[in-house]
Amino acid sequence: FLCFATLSTKAMADLTYKTYAGTGARPSFPGNGGSLTYPTVLSTGTVTSLNYNWGSGYVLDSGRGSSVIVNFYGYITIPDTGSQDIQFYLYADDGAYMKIDSTVVINDWNEQSPGMWNYISTDQTLTGGQTYYIDVWWYENGGGAALKLYWDQTGSVALVPSSAYSTTEPVVVSGITSSQTTKFNTIRNKAVNGNQIYITQTGDGNTLNILQDGDD
């Protein structure tokens, strides 16, 4: 028997961010159909997770502790396999907005004290092992600043781990080598006990089944 593997090449386990100058309470941003009043980017970079409580300090490297907007974006991979109903929670101060692919899952663009129960999504039916685009907007007008992303994926609420994030979509790479392909080409026309061997390819293109017509 020949063994074959499918390799998943994961990008850096981060999210990309951009910080912008804020414009007071409930500033306009692209997610709510508006545009940034001051679209000049203050800073850019990557973060390993959404787990911040800045208090009255500077938000990331924006040079601001208030009147600031941050857009975090990248990809999130759902663990395990099969269809899952997942709830997301944003612990945020002040407003927050979040999309998974093209679906808005949280939209609470308001002045609030931090608390993830104020920012909770409905159940999102997602597939384990699949990767989705994530887009989070957040702003701070004044006072304390915080942003953390949690999910309920197993029946309990937990911080989304950094391993779930990636800056670019992971690429699935075939583990079938040219040498293995040659071996297949060699054996596929041979007969076993006078019976023809058929080789079929199924699934994602990386799983190969060898079927013998006749004797099992």
Where are these regions (language model features)?
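Extreme N-terminus of proteins, especially the signal/transit-peptide cleavage junction
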Residues: 10, 81-82, 190-194
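Low-complexity repeat regions of mature extracellularly deployed or surface/particle-associated proteins
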Residues: 172-216
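Bacterial N-terminal signal peptides
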Residues: 1-6
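Sec/Tat signal peptide C-region and signal peptidase I cleavage site
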Residues: 7-13
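Acidic/polar, compositionally biased interaction segments
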Residues: 13-176
